[in-house]
């Protein structure tokens, strides 16, 4: 990234509103990434089947699916800051709930409740940052905000995984309860009490139908229905694959995920700014889709890694650890997935915010973005889990990669450039 782009991003943190959103987003993302690592450990601890491990993702996504439209509409007609604070308080309760998890069924329940806090914080935060960003710099604002998300998840992969490795579940969740509580106070103090620009003259259905008449929105929604199947399946089952097939500990799983997170943390802001400058945002999305499919299809190659990559032995805090060859294959795959996400995510968010502003419905547009994701996200983890039980991890990951490519074809077929509506 050039010096000018870096300086532009750093300048955003002088804005009190953006800084408050960034702090909140950092804590949220770090906790989320730590939970993803923990799910693989829980799957091993509770000796779950692939189906039950899939429920860890499906329970979370199903609740988000149910709530995404009403939450988005709330943002359009009421104070988005108030909703954001409610979601952050629920996040504290969720993290406290993880302290008491003692079975797979309890974990599924906590994951479902996490879906409530997650969708609330995600939609409110994204809508606010998209609307605060001035015209011409919105891609920079959105990209930098996503950059914070990526960097926070990178921190979760490393620091959160380290906490799980050294101090265990209960102490890790207690630390995140404290951090999340502090982030609530910071948002209350520094985020301006300004709702997202709203217009309550039409119904939720009317807003969504109006947005779907736009070809860009139609293409994005159709693509996200199937692409989310792949994305969420990888998110849940790559760590589970690493744990159950190769016995990797929390540090190694976190290290794998850190590869992709690091890529996103250093590139999304630049990609957002590049999109502002050159336009043609749909090309960024298409290239990202293809790269994601390739990275997903390569994941099963890890089972052959020891044939050409020797294990590496090292000592961590007095403990002897062996890094299997599969670690390096999975690390490379997740780096490739991180590059793909860097191309796709900031440009997609910018397109949804832009189209939402045309119709004074930023909240509904962002909620439509999430709604289109949640169906595949709900089905994907369980479907892939069943495939790992009945077939194999190879079949499951290849099926996910195929669906990602189909999503790209669908997007390319439906997308058309259109002028703003009259």
Indicate where each model-derived feature is located.
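Conserved MFS/SLC helix-loop-helix module at the cytosolic interface between two early adjacent transmembrane helices
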Residues: 66-102
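Juxtamembrane intracellular "pre-TM" segments in multi-pass secondary transporters
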Residues: 2-15, 190-223, 244
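C-terminal membrane-cytosol helix-exit motif in multi-pass small-molecule transporters
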Residues: 177-196, 407-415
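Structural signature of the two symmetry-related core transmembrane helices
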Residues: 82-97, 283-298, 398
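Helix-breaking motifs and short loop linkers at transmembrane-helix boundaries and internal kinks
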Residues: 47, 79, 100-105, 247, ...
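Cytoplasmic helix-loop-helix junction between adjacent transmembrane helices
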Residues: 110-151
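Helix-to-loop junctions at the C-terminal end of transmembrane segments
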Residues: 67-79, 268-280, 388
